[in-house]
Amino acid sequence: MSHCFVKRLSLCICTALLVASCAKQNKQAFYNTGIIYCSESNPVTFNPQLDTSSTTSDASSHQLYDRLLDFDPESGRIVPSLASSWLVSDDGLTYAFQLRKDVWFHNTRYFTPTRNFNADDVIFSIDRWRLRSHPYHYVSGGRYPYFESIGLAQNIASVERVNGYRVEITLKRRDSSFLANLATDFAVILSEEYANQLAQTGTPGKIDELPVGTGPFKFDSYRKDHFIKFLRHDNYWRDQMEDAPTSDEALSYNNTVESANQEVENGQGGEDTVQDGTAQNGDETRPVVEQLIFDITPRSSLRLAKLMTGECDATAFPAQTELEVIRAKEDLTLAEKPGLNIGFWAFNTQRPPFDNPDVRRALAAAIDKNTLLEAVYFDSATRAKTLLPAASWAFQNDADDTAYNPVLARKLLADAGVKAGFSMTIWAMPVERSYNPNATKMAELIQRYLRDVGVEATIVSYDWTTFRRHLQEGLHDSVLIGWSADNGDPDNFYRPLLSCGAIPSGTNRAMWCSEDYDKLLNDALQTDDIEERTAIYRQVNRLLYERLPLVPIAHAYRYQAYRNELEGMTINPFGGVRFGGVKKAL
């Protein structure tokens, strides 16, 4: 062996060792300063105005953006965010928002902001979804499902710039849920300056593909079916906030918030309804990690395996069958909380014979909901009588509920002219959700129940994007799906799921429209009195029981599994995972 060869071999070995050492150091550096989250699917978009799925919200609203208002993660109360305070007129129609100063948008490889966030960004963001004449309204399809489903655009008379840091929004009629809707995942604030830059280059669609926000993380890269990479937003405005207030200041502030939130909950609040957010961090806190990776892993069992081996720090939607495994692992944490959600079986009421309430009643009587809960949820859910869970202030414990009665089911079907052997489809969503962790299994159980009453059911499923598109097209006979609340107002369940306006937006899976129902919902938003609203919602529950466009099945607990090294993880009351303020204990 020549001396020259030995030298070259030694050099190669040293180089390999150096590379391995650097790689190990880089991996350790990322482990110390980065978080990997095992996500279940691809986001539909990086603009949550355009999509209502929790996958999209997790990858966009919760990490990239801020809103005018937020929800406190513990109490669910409305707290300031980009709006530091607000005033409400005596007639309840005009809302004046004071905006924070020194808030910067993300500085990325594709956009460098030249100014701070201001009133122009608020007006641009709201007018995009509310005005069809807006130059960005039809970009990326021109559908804004959440806002369409609640009819908010039709109720806003104007959005006006008072000055650079003050905006006034005037409504056409009172809406006791208005502030709560501004705090939802979908009411994000975009950069008008970035939009203008894209318009000048003829690429407006990039605003939803290469996002820019003010949130705790900024977008870096995305590879479909593989990963999303976020970087820390170094100029995040919450990092610039002053230290926490003194105890006297905190007491004064908390009293103001307590009073104002009570007025908001009661639909009240005149010129003296003021909230000052200078000492409040809301639901997003300071990011203390340099990188955030979403590892897109559709299979729940694989997500759990990655969590257990440390390849992921947290995981989405652990399966009910995995909960005991997670609880038994000393290095893992399983947080849980009753969910503000509803899992249901919806009938396409625009397709015969499902347009007949008696047929819908027959199908509801054919299934045993208790068995579905035991087999699919494993004691991690409660039986649903109405759309509202027990945590809602309008919950009705004595509401009417469907009962398992196959004899009645056969009679109703026969009386409606539905002959034995009638066939239908049950669409089962292909993703796991807290409100229905295994739609396919539930569909199989319902399929057996229906066979007992002479109905042959075929189970249909597609990939998530195709599934949602075909639902929007109304190709289903029935579907197993659900809803997680975006805010604590009862209207957030009733209106998006079953109002006439929610059909074109795609959130009304029953495609059911009732003028009586819509009138009751509108009446409920006109009153300031909680007892009056509750009484109206009792009428709503009775109407839904009589006409049964869908069968409420379960209100599920929400779970979040993560490694013990993570600190600051919380379960948001309205769903989703947020990594602002989460850090790793080294």
Segments (PLM) and residue ranges:
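Long beta-strand-rich cores associated with HINT superfamily self-processing modules
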Residues: 412, 560-586
